Amino acid sequence: MHKLKLHGFNNLTKSLSFCIYDICYTKTADDRDGYIAYIDEQYNANRLTEILTKTCSIIGANVLNIARQDYEPQGASVTILVSEEPIDPRDVDTSEHPGPLPNSVVAHLDKSHICVHTYPESHPEGGLCTFRADIEVSTCGVISPLKALNYLIHQLESDIVTIDYRVRGFTRDVNGIKHFIDHQINSVQNFMSEDMKSLYHMMDVNVYQENIFHTKMLLKDFDLKHYLFNVSPEELNAAERKRITDLLYHEMQEIYYGRNLPVI
C-alpha cells in the first residue's frame, strides 16, 4: 500500500477487542468448584499481566502504568497504559499478514491501552462451566493492534473466539485530505497464521464502509477428554459420553452464534 505523507500526528484510533471462551463439563458440585478455582488461578492477575506485558512488546508499546486486581469469589482485571515513542512510519509494516507467535516475539514498535477482564461462570444444574476473558488492545497512530492477535489466541487456548476490529477518527495528509483508514484490510483472518486458521471454523461479518471487521472462531476438533474435569471418558458409559458430548456441543454452538438454540 502507498505510504501516506501526513500533516502532523496520525490521529486514527485502532481497537482490537475480543472475547475468548473455555468450556468444561464437571460431574459434581465439588468438581465445579474445583474447575472454577483452577481456572481462576490459571488466569490470575499476575499471569494476565505477563501476557499483556508481552503483548506490549509485540505492538511496540512502552509501559507507563499497570493496574491489576484479583477479585473474590473469582475473576481478575489488568489494565496497562502505554505510550508511543517517535518512530519512522517507513519502518512500520501495515501489510495484511499474521503477527508473531509466542516463540518469535520481537519488540519493534510502540503505543495507548491494553486491558483484560476474566469471567468464570457456572450453573448448579447441568454441569457446564465457562471461562470468558474480554481483551482490548487500543492504539493511536500508525501501530496496529492486529499484530498481537496471533499471540493472544495462542496464549489463551480458546475454544471459541469473537473478534472485533475497528478504526475510528481520521488523519490528514499534507494536502489536507482526510483519511479514515491508513492500511488495507479485507478480513481479520488475514492477520492469523495458517496453523491457527486450520484449527478453527471461521465466519466474518464486516461493515467495510464503517471500517468495522468482525470474525467468529469455533474450534474444529472436538475431543471429549479435553472438556472433562476430574474424570476421563473411560470412566463414563456410552450413554453418558453421548449426553455430555451433546450438551457441550449445544453450549458451544449457542456461544458461537450468540443466540439460544432449540435442543434437538
UniProtKB/Swiss-Prot annotation:
Manner of cofactor binding, per the entry note: Binds 1 pyruvoyl group covalently per subunit.
On this chain, the residues bearing Pyruvic acid (Ser) are S112
GO MF, one example: adenosylmethionine decarboxylase activity
**Active-site residues?**
S112 (schiff-base intermediate with substrate), H117 (proton acceptor), C140 (proton donor)
Which Pfam families does this entry report, sorted A to Z?
Answer: AdoMet_dc
InterPro entries assigned: AdoMetDC_fam_prok (IPR003826), S-AdoMet_deCO2ase_bac (IPR009165), S-AdoMet_deCO2ase_core (IPR016067)
Query: Annotated pathway, please?
Result: Amine and polyamine biosynthesis; S-adenosylmethioninamine biosynthesis; S-adenosylmethioninamine from S-adenosyl-L-methionine: step 1/1
Site feature Cleavage (non-hydrolytic): at which residues? K111, S112
Catalytic reactions of this protein: S-adenosyl-L-methionine + H(+) = S-adenosyl 3-(methylsulfanyl)propylamine + CO2
Modification(s) after translation: Is synthesized initially as an inactive proenzyme. Formation of the active enzyme involves a self-maturation process in which the active site pyruvoyl group is generated from an internal serine residue via an autocatalytic post-translational modification. Two non-identical subunits are generated from the proenzyme in this reaction, and the pyruvate is formed at the N-terminus of the alpha chain, which is derived from the carboxyl end of the proenzyme.
Q: Which UniProt keywords apply?
A: Autocatalytic cleavage, Decarboxylase, Lyase, Polyamine biosynthesis, Pyruvate, S-adenosyl-L-methionine, Schiff base, Spermidine biosynthesis, Zymogen
What EC number(s) does the entry state? 4.1.1.50
Q: Which cofactor does it need?
A: pyruvate
* S-adenosyl-L-methionine recorded as keyword: yes
For this record, an example GO cellular component is:
cytosol
Q: Name one GO biological process term.
A: spermidine biosynthetic process
Under Gene3D superfamilies, the record lists: S-adenosylmethionine decarboxylase
Q: Which family does it belong to?
A: Belongs to the prokaryotic AdoMetDC family. Type 2 subfamily.
Assembly and binders: Heterooctamer of four alpha and four beta chains arranged as a tetramer of alpha/beta heterodimers.
Biological role: Catalyzes the decarboxylation of S-adenosylmethionine to S-adenosylmethioninamine (dcAdoMet), the propylamine donor required for the synthesis of the polyamines spermine and spermidine from the diamine putrescine.
Q: What is this protein called?
A: S-adenosylmethionine decarboxylase proenzyme
Supply the source organism for this entry: Pectobacterium carotovorum subsp. carotovorum (strain PC1)
Question: Its gene?
Answer: speD
